[in-house]
Amino acid sequence: MTANHDALVEAVFPLEGKALPRDHAQALQHALAEQLPWLRSDAGAGIHPLKLVSGPESLALLSQRTRLILRVDANRLDELKALCGVELDVSGHALRLGAVHLRALQPLATLYAYRVAAVGADESEFMQAMEAELTELAIAGERVCGKRQSLRRDGLDMTTFSMMLHGLVPEQSLRLQQHGLGPHRLLGCGLFVPHKSAAAVGV
């Protein structure tokens, strides 16, 4: 399905729950797609990584401030409202959604992605691939590659890198947030958000 990139917003849900597996991205994707089947075919949709606190063994803990944020078409609001009170089963852990509110994308000069999917572990090859995508999107600004991480997908480890761009003009900032970089938006990859400091990529 072709995405209406101009209509993309952030849909923010409060959460009730205790813990999730540290590597929960694919399980969360599946749980949400059961409630919103169109997520699987909507090219513009994305699920932001959850901000969790390290817990015992292989668990990560939710805090009172943890939010589920989806990047979706604003025209889906009625379907998103229907999720209020729904309990997701994420690898055997319960996650209850609160009432959604929408937040517009902000055209800030500095954008950060917690993870962008890479074909391999080589940073220079990753940056070359990103440069090609950014050129196609006509996006300038300074690029900074950050931390290499791994993400479980279909039982295998996938390499990702964090990434920051700064010095963007408003039109470029919105375009990058609307289109993203690389694949796997529903695993939280390639989704850029406004950020205040370039120091974050090294964290």
List the predicted regions and their residue ranges.
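RNA-interacting cores
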Residues: 1-203
